[in-house]
Amino acid sequence: MTTQLDSLRNMTVVVADTGDIEAIKKYQPEDATTNPSLILSASALPQYASLIDEAIAYAKSKSNCSKQQLIDAEDKLAVNIGLEILKIVPGRISTEVDARLSYDTQATIEKAKKLIALYNEAGISNDRILIKIASTWQGIRAAEELEKQGINCNLTLLFSEAQARACAEAGVYLISPFVGRILDWYKANSDKKDYAPAEDPGVISVTKIYNYYKQHGYNTIVMGASFRNVGEITELAGCDRLTIAPALLKELQENNAPLERKLSYTGEVKAKPQPLTEAEFYWQHNSDAMAVEKLADGIRKFAADQEKLEAMLLTKF
């Protein structure tokens, strides 16, 4: 019997949104994505204790400065978890830059290069890694430079059409437009609490971005992310990639209902517009209250989890 997960795989690259090795083994995704929150939860799993110990030992060998040791340990732990995942997935791992660098182009570039160097030292080539960066103007500029240097990027926390357009114009490899967090905002800020999948504002956002990219011939991959229910996923069947948490992969695997392709583009390709200026980007992005609030909120939450991870690591030194 064909499951919905099998059907989805025939039209979309399925990615696992988790740092849990056992879940990745079970659902056999092409790629996997991590973020500071997922690294924090994964680091609490007993099978990862040795990865933490190794990261601490590495940090101690690199510096005598306690502040630098902590930075080195958290970077090495993220890469160690990525290395374990790469033993299972045939494709790429996404590893995220510290969210506290989201408004600093140069610091983001330097952190990305450090993460890449750690992977390279472990024998992993650049074509198996995506560096995740928040889709701020500064993050997009960092990604533009990194792409020129052969480091592919995954631009995350993407909520507005302005962010999506700026990413494509910068030539980034992949974007992760969020679905569920958009739905969360509309539920919290309107009287409407129930949305059918086709009218889900997060689904509508990703569909618009997908169609815009295809209409204008942009090569940037669209990978829908942050799902609250299976309906959001099935409504985006056909998207280039979808990154899905294990609980929702399980639901898809247990459902044998037919799955219809929802996203595809067969029309002619239009000319690309002139790239957005910084002023135009900020005007358009800031015209969308949801996008402004969710980008800032997402950065704050990832930064908070990075700090919790640091607090945990400090107890290990």
UniProtKB/Swiss-Prot annotation:
Q: What is its main location?
A: cytoplasm
Q: Which domain of life is it from?
A: Bacteria
In this protein, the active site sits at: 132 (schiff-base intermediate with substrate)
Give the subcellular location.
Cytoplasm
Q: Name one GO molecular function term.
A: transaldolase activity
Q: Which InterPro entries match?
A: Aldolase_TIM (IPR013785), TAL/FSA (IPR001585), Transaldolase_1 (IPR004730), Transaldolase_AS (IPR018225)
What's the EC number here? 2.2.1.2
Which NCBIfam families does the record cross-reference, listed alphabetically? PRK12346.1 (NF009001), talAB (TIGR00874)
Subunit structure, per the record? Answer: Homodimer.
Q: What does this protein do?
A: Transaldolase is important for the balance of metabolites in the pentose-phosphate pathway.
Tell me the protein's name.
Transaldolase A
| Species, as recorded | Pasteurella multocida (strain Pm70)
Gene encoding this polypeptide?
A: talA
